[in-house]
Amino acid sequence: MNTLGRFLRLTTFGESHGDMIGGVLDGMPSGIKIDYDLLENEMKRRQGGRNIFTTPRKEDDKVEITSGVFEGFSAGTPIGFLIHNQRARSKDYDNIKNLFRPSHADFTYFHKYGIRDFRGGGRSSARESAIRVAAGAFAKMLLREIGVVCESGIIKIGGIEAKNYDFNHALKSEIFALDKEQEEAQKTAIQNAIKNHDSIGGVALIRARGAKTNQKLPIGLGQGLYAKLDAKIAEAMMGLNGVKAVEIGKGVESSLLKGSEYNDLMSQKGFLSNHSGGVLGGMSNGEEIIVKVHFKPTPSIFQPQRTIDIKGNECECLLKGRHDPCIAIRGSVVCESLLSLVLADMVLLNLTSKIEYLKTIYNEN
């Protein structure tokens, strides 16, 4: 219900304008050094209020670890952590407390639960994704132990698409742009949306790779039927607010190709292409895992919109508040965290795949 993962399980709680949001990460092996600098940096990457291209709401996003860590290392017990909400402005939503905001979750949440938490969307707010980023930082600490790195960036804003992918540039870019040559045009598209009291959609690219040059990813992460790696990746990404489509490898373009064009041919040195995006038969094949995540435009726009109230009466909705003009930007960081969580979960699952692995653990002496 509120949990992601099987062997590494993240459960989250809290609402956008509540006192705090939090999570419990269960299944983290003991003995992993907690990198507090990494944790803080990941939270800052997702943080709003850093420039005009994100929401003006700037939370401190300090992660308070309450359990599961002893003397700087994971203890093997559930890691509990909290993030306090300090910049919420519920009054911005007073005028729409009985209205349904178009393309928001207000309508479905109200009909499912019978409760209208109008304060920034309550549980359905993207504020909850801060917990996923914190948990993703812990997952990255685990993956680092086996030489796996996840990274992300923006490849498309509206119709302006990157032609080159530079993940190092994305780390320095205000909008996490992968293509320096297209960055200004992408920024202009966002600024034009802001001027018109509108928003704009975008596409994030997330990849997992070996930490060292020419280092491959582990082969066999995932299972062939009911725990397919690509299915778990898609499930995690689609569970994030605003995501409308997920592609792995060539994705939808695959349906336009012939087998002779799509197949990843092999040599003694390995695969000659990576149209599969690093996944075959539901399992990692050692190549880079390539994921594209498509975000819809932010539904919170500052234009009059036609809607209904909780009694079904037609009315006009004019929003206030602080909102991202393009949720894909900060969403890319969350997707990177989600891929880290999925891969860490699959690494732990893989320990059960061969008896040799268990013998290594239990027959050391």
UniProtKB/Swiss-Prot annotation:
Record CDD domains: Chorismate_synthase
Statement: the UniProt record of this protein carries the keyword Lyase: yes
Assigned EC number: 4.2.3.5
Binding, NADP(+): R46
Sorted UniProt keywords: Amino-acid biosynthesis, Aromatic amino acid biosynthesis, FAD, Flavoprotein, FMN, Lyase, NADP
Enzyme class label: lyase
Listed PROSITE patterns: CHORISMATE_SYNTHASE_1 (PS00787), CHORISMATE_SYNTHASE_2 (PS00788), CHORISMATE_SYNTHASE_3 (PS00789)
InterPro entries from the UniProt entry: Chorismate_synth, Chorismate_synth_AroC_sf, Chorismate_synthase_CS
GO MF annotations in UniProt: chorismate synthase activity; FMN binding
Lineage: Bacteria, Pseudomonadati, Campylobacterota, Epsilonproteobacteria, Campylobacterales
Binding site for FMN: R123, S124, S125, N241, G242, G281, K296, P297, T298, P299, S300, R322
Cofactor names: FMNH2
Reaction equations catalysed: 5-O-(1-carboxyvinyl)-3-phosphoshikimate = chorismate + phosphate
Gene name of the encoded protein: aroC
Protein known as: Chorismate synthase
Function per UniProt: This reaction introduces a second double bond into the aromatic ring system.
GO biological process terms on file: amino acid biosynthetic process; aromatic amino acid family biosynthetic process; chorismate biosynthetic process
HAMAP family: Chorismate_synth
Family: Belongs to the chorismate synthase family.
Annotated Gene Ontology cellular component terms: cytosol
Cofactor info, note text: Reduced FMN (FMNH(2)).
Subunit structure: Homotetramer.
Associated pathway: Metabolic intermediate biosynthesis; chorismate biosynthesis; chorismate from D-erythrose 4-phosphate and phosphoenolpyruvate: step 7/7
